[in-house]
Amino acid sequence: MSALWSAWGADAFTEQVEKATSEMLPVGSEDIALNLEICDQVRAKQVPAKQAMQVLKRRLSHKNPNVVLLALGLTDICIKNGGDHFLQQVASREFMDNLLSVLRNPAGVNNDVKNKALGLIQNWSQIAQAKPAHMSYITDIYQQLKSDDQFDFPPLDPNAAAVAAALVETLTAPEWVDGDVCMRCRTAFTTFNRKHHCRNCGNVFCQQCSSHNMALSWFGIGQDVRVCDGCYARKGPPKNALKLSRSKSASSSSPSTSSSKHVPSGRGASSSSSHHRSATLGAKSKRSARQKEEDDIALAIKLSLEASAETAPQRSRPTSFATPSQPSAATLSAHKPPNGRVLEGTDADNDPDLAAAIAASLRDWAPPQPSAPFGLNDTAGPAPTSATDASQSANSHLPLPPSLDLAPQDVDNILTFSQTVQAQQAHNQRTGMVGAPLPASVQAMYEKASSARPRMARNLEEGHRRHNVLVSMHDKLTEAVHLYDRLLDAQMTRPAQAYAPHGYAQATYPAASHQGYGYGYQPSIPLHESAYAAQQAGPSSLYLQTPQSHAGPLSDYSGTPAPWLPQQQQQLQPQPQTQPPQYEQPPYQPTQQPYAPHAAQPQYARDQPPPQHSAQQQQQQQQQQQQQQQQQQQQKQQQKQQQKQQQQQHLNPQYQQYASPNPVSNHANAVYADPNQALSPTSTVANTAQYAAYDYSGATIDHASHTQANSVAHTTAPAYAQTNGAASMSSAEPLASQPPDTLSVRTQGIMGGAPSNVSTVVPADKSQVINDGKGNESISTSHLPEDASISSRNGWSAVPTPALTEGALERTATGTDVQHQRQQQSYHQQQAPVKADTSYLPLFPVAPHPDNGFGPDRNAAEATSPMASPYTNAPSSAGMWQNPAGTGVTSASANANANANANADAAATESPLIEF
């Protein structure tokens, strides 16, 4: 009854052991079939060897002598048929000390139990002599009991030792070999392409290469388990199975032996048994595949972190491929309690011991860390005093990677098999025996050569990994070298102008094409200063002024010539600026002046060119300036000659009386000559009388003032606004504020299209006529009377001051006015020119235009549009008093007198074109 209660809740293996050693069995009767089945489970590693040893140890401590006798017999059968891994557990201190305590029981021991136990210990000691690495502790117990007089051993059989050694030679399932790729098709393992181990050879394969199942009776495995394609075709154990089991048992016995000498009883062989694959006949797992996969990954990560934390200071590579896992992982897994197992043939989904073994194997075969960081981390001690000591210390800290060469024996086996197969194939071809079976020796050579395949695969993978590491390091080094070369090139090619001389900030100069001359270094003038340069001279700035009159902020700087200053002024003032021929001056030649730096004006000092370039640049600039001036003068003379030829060819004899009186002209549009000769159609000789320039020193410019760069206030012309045909000024100052003796001339379209209101002082006798009129309001807009409308398109427009009256409407002739306009034209052509007093007014030449009636296209132009007639509002460059909207420009008084006489309307149809 106690046996039933003790077996409650036990696993299947414990139940089978209790059934084989039951109290109900008669004395001397054993269930051999059940004992062999239990032995096969131990041999096939379906049950851990340590767990089987503990179950038998409990049965040996039973009070019933019959149970103890049956347990001793079952233990002897398992030792002879269980394999070397079970021998290690039986020879441990935990099992042998318990058996010794049974023999030395103070209460006494049964004689049958005592005699059978002493006989088994004597036989096991003889087996231990053949396997000293596995069963050395049994030999010690035998010698201890033999020296004691209380125990009498039976006589020793001389042949028993050889027989026992032969009986314990048992084939067992090989240890599993781990890898990242399939050892048959070389396919990498992933989350979905899982790895599978062959139970016959222990290698790792993919699903396609290990899809067969069969029973392995030579290993004591009666169930169908997974095998690879090669083992399934062989239908037998591998040829090196016994050798592998011996070598692995020998290599794994060393930690157990060492631990048996220093570890207390019961913990001797725990390090080696934790790595063995085990399974039971229990129920299948109920968890899903996804849950099992997540648990496996979590367990592997946990074990890897723990192992890396413990073995970080002394991490090193194994010296041989047959070295087992690290003892640290084995110790961790040894303390785990036994749990339920799964059937043989699954991939250890619920086996934590196997998962720990796999994690340890992965850690063993992990790629080594880079040598440089590893060596730097380890050099925490004092630095060596000499270079030799430093190299020795570095070599001692850096572990050498294992060699990738195969063992000489493996190389010999592979070459022997290859040469034998080639010779056999050549012999078959010569004799014509194609397809003849190979001899047995060739099959043995194939098995020997195949044993080196896993090691060769691992070496190949390690070689590829090292090659990839070296390639990546080479790429990084190449990239670093390229970056370093770029930095050196950038430093060598950096321009010298990037550094500011004398500690001042480097000024930014515009391109040479902006200045008109191809000099590489020319200080630029701000636009607001250049624009103000033409207005600084006062009302006489309508003509080209000499540069000496300009007193700008750049007058202090004269270190380098600036031939581009007039060109900038001409670009800002696109209207023609000409003088009479007798007053035409040569181009401005700036003189070289010594440059004296001003301490109070550092903003001009930074515009100074570098000292090493100033002297050469000045000489080059002077030479280039002289050459360019000569070229410009030649081009101007050629253009003038071409223009004169064109004018003489296309001049219609009908309009000879309106031609320019002076045939020699230095201007593209017209010439400045005597206005008296301009009114005479027969005069062809220009008067050489000297006329004063249009300059009134007392003239004022009514502009809105603003601050210039040199803190000098100047004015800006106010804008005109035309609304409903009336001219009005947007200036804040009323017209009534102007002095009574001023003449206001509207110059819209001049100075680059900017409107301007220039007030000039008029002599008293001339201004009296104006003051007697409508007052200051009439001065805002000036109109010409009918008698002053006779003008020439290529001559001069005489505008007498007394004729300035309150202007009539200026409008475009449309509709019925076209006929009246043509009549006026024919009338004016027949009239003799009227000479007026124009000694005090400026003279405005009319520029020729291809559409204003001159040239061979006059008839076509008048036929196309009457507005293109020379006596109508033809296009001009200045466009003064033009009305594009078609409405006349009138003053306030002209708007009041809307019904003017017909003569005023007729005169308004022709607007005199005045161009500066």
From Swiss-Prot:
Residues 238-293, 307-350, 365-407, 543-624, 641-669, 723-798, 850-892 are annotated as: Disordered. Residues 577-589 have a biased composition (Pro residues). Zn(2+) 1 binds at residues 182, 185, 206, 209. InterPro entries: ENTH_VHS, HGS/VPS27, UIM_dom, VHS_dom, Znf_FYVE, Znf_FYVE-rel, Znf_FYVE_PHD, Znf_RING/FYVE/PHD. Zn(2+) 2 binds at residues 198, 201, 228, 231. Residues 247-273, 561-576, 590-605 have a biased composition (Low complexity). Coiled coil: none annotated. Keywords: Endosome, Membrane, Metal-binding, Repeat, Zinc, Zinc-finger. Residues 274-289 have a biased composition (Basic residues). Residues 22-153 form the VHS domain. Gene3D superfamilies: 1.20.5.1940, 1.25.40.90, 6.10.140.100, Zinc/RING finger domain, C3HC4 (zinc finger). GO terms for molecular function: phosphatidylinositol binding; ubiquitin binding; zinc ion binding. It holds the Pfam family VHS. One of its GO terms (cellular component) is early endosome. Residues 292-311, 349-368 form the UIM domain. Its main location: membrane. The keyword Metal-binding applies. It is found in: Endosome membrane. A zinc finger (FYVE-type) spans 176-236. Residues 311-331, 385-396, 650-668, 777-795, 866-890 have a biased composition (Polar residues). SUPFAM superfamilies: ENTH/VHS domain, FYVE/PHD zinc finger. Belongs to the VPS27 family. The FYVE domain is involved in the binding to phosphatidylinositol 3-phosphate (PtdIns(3)P) which is required for the association to endosomal membranes. Component of the ESCRT-0 complex composed of HSE1 and VPS27. This is Vacuolar protein sorting-associated protein 27.
